[in-house]
Each structure stands twice: as structure tokens, then as C-alpha cells.
Amino acid sequence: MTDLRLFTSESVTEGHPDKICDQISDSILDALLTQDPSSRAAVETLVTTGLVHVAGEVTTSGYVDIPQIVRDRIRDIGYDSSEVGFDGSNCGVTVSIGAQSPDIAQGVDRSYESRSGSASTDAHDLQGAGDQGLMFGYASRDTPVFMPLPIYLAHRLAERLAAVRHSGELSYLRPDGKTQVTIGYEGLVPRTVDTVVLSTQHGPQVSQEDLRREVEEHVIRPVLAAAAEIGIELDSRDATLLINPTGKFEIGGPKGDAGLTGRKIIVDTYGGFSRHGGGAFSGKDPSKVDRSAAYAMRWVAKNAVAAGLADRLEVQVAYAIGKAAPVGLYVEAFGTAHVPEDRIVRAIRETFDLRPAAIVERLDLLRPIYAETAAYGHFGRELPDFTWEALDRVADLQSAAGL
């Protein structure tokens, strides 16, 4: 097979320093929403050797024990002793949390439409967007869950790497790790696994030869086999497998690298297959359209591709701070549209209410569901709480598009 185009995406495990921070921020958000569903939060976390610092803005009627949440999450990930380089029980935890700016709150609590007298009687007109910005959603027919194949496989490898560590199947593994998958495409069709890169932290008791053999046997091959079982047909016979290509990886986690919330936005979304508006997700309550509108755009794109409007679809929405109605909606079908793109835009407008309050209500986002999103991808996992993955607007879109 010749003339394949190679596309690569990466993922990281829950023990990667940046992902530790995302999970801490979202665990704090979940605790706040459990006590007060109307909580406003923007929680940022930094981890480094022996220290966690939590900062940001929170407005809530509840109370949460942030240091305890931090320690519990770190231990759950697997950093529970100095032997692995970080210990949730003994690390330092500092907290600097203030209230949300009243200048921001005024635009969310009372929208531009409400203040200017142009609001309708619809309650969804009363809440403005929490910031200006642009958000993208994407879907394709690469996989049964309508995700690009490279990021889908990278996430499954990272999940499997964590699973065999937690189960004790590969007891020498430690929490930090990264995966990367390069897929060969013939036109728009994925054909081959070209390269898999997997780097995993480990204890000193295992040789690199044994680690590479066992990671291939217990992680890589099972993931590729599982993909085949759900109809993803790929030729991996000539795939290059690079497992810990630098050699030993004993120093990892916050001892090896500092971590920050929001530094894995491409891992969190589509692995580079789609554009990104720049806003991170974790630690933000759903009044922040960086998060809620990105979830809505995934919902839109997935339903539109499932409805047969296009085989690949990227959608963009844009907001002005304090304004309820979006200021822009754009679609790109990359030459795969089955109806004109202007008709796709009209069908989306007819089918989806993209005002922030409507998104929050339709997707039921004022719930403590966010820690689960913070590792292995916000999209493409059809879990019960991931309402943005539901294919519940397919018939409506087909009708609106005249299919």
C-alpha cells in the first residue's frame, strides 16, 4: 500500500503531572457542585516536587475541604509513597482561592439581552456567556464512537496502561506515562498502524527488555485486538513499537516535571484533528462556555455525522461575554458533506439551542460529573454522565436538512 498520509495523536495517563492537576481541579469542582449546584468555579492547580498549590476563584454557598480532596485524588491515582516519587499523604498543599469578580458575574447573572431590553420571555435569554471566545466540536466516521482514530487508540492505550498497573497485572508500573499513535490514511480511510510510542514510569526491579515485552503483550496487543472486535480494521503487522525509547523511566510524576491545569487541551479533545479555541476545561463550572459550549459542539458534530449530513464535520461557535445568543456559527465538512454546508448550518440552528443556559439545561451540566472527564478524553467515551455523547438529535437534524 503506497501514498499513505500519516497522522499522529497522543494521550497521557492519569499520573502525568498535567493530568494530576486537571483531576484535582475537577474533583474540587465536583465537591462544590455536590453542595451547591449553582457554584461558580475556576480552579487552577500546580504540582511540583512534594507540593500542590491550588488557586482560582470560587463563589458558592457550600464548603469543601480542599486539602483533603487534593490528597484523596493523588492517592487514588497511585502516588501514595515516597518510593513512587510523590505521596498524597505527606505532600504540601497550599490554597489561594478568592471570589469570582463581580464584573464578570454581572454579565452572567443578567445577560446583555436582559440589560438592553431585547430579551424574550424565555428564561434562557437571561444568562449571558461567562466569557468571549470560540469553541470547536468535531466528529468523523473513523470509529464507532465518531472520534478520530489516532486519539481514540492513544486514549485506549493510556487507559489500558493504567488498568494493568491498578490491577497488579504489571506490578512494577508507576503512574506516569504517555502514549502516541501514528495512523496511515488512504484518503480519508485509516488503513495501517504505522507507529506506537509508549513511555511508562516503572520501578527499578524490572529490566527494559522485560518491560518492553510485557507492555507489548499486556497493553498494546490487547488494545489493537479490542479495536478489531468493534470493527476497526487496521493492518498493524509492520507497525513500529517504541516502548520507553529513552531507556529507564524511574523518575516521573511531579518529581520529574511540574504540572499545571489546562496544559493538555489537545489530548482532552481530538488529538489535533480539529482546531481548538484555546480554552481549557478542567476546574471550570458550566457557566464558562470554554467548557459547556465545547461539549455542546461535540454533541452537535456527533449527531450531524450520525445523521449523514457529512462524514467529517467540524463546527465552531463563538460568544461575547455577557451575551446569551452566540455571535457566530460555522461548519467545515472537508469535502465530505452530503448536503450543502449552508443547509447544515440551518439544520443546526433549527435543532440546537446554543445559548449557555440552554446548553447547561439540555446536557444537565450542573452535576458532579467532571472528575471522570479529566483523564482519557472528554469526548468519545459513551459513559452515562457524558450527555454530550448522546445520539438524540439525529432524526431532528435529518428532518431539518431535508434528508
UniProtKB/Swiss-Prot annotation:
Residues given in the record as Mg(2+) binding sites: D18
Residue segments, region Disordered: 106-126
An example Gene Ontology molecular-function term: ATP binding
Binding site for ATP: H16, D176, G177, K178, K248, F249, D257, R263, K264, A280, K284
Enzyme class, broadest EC rank: transferase
Complexes and interactors: Homotetramer; dimer of dimers.
Purpose of the protein: Catalyzes the formation of S-adenosylmethionine (AdoMet) from methionine and ATP. The overall synthetic reaction is composed of two sequential steps, AdoMet formation and the subsequent tripolyphosphate hydrolysis which occurs prior to release of AdoMet from the enzyme.
The protein's name in its UniProt record: S-adenosylmethionine synthase
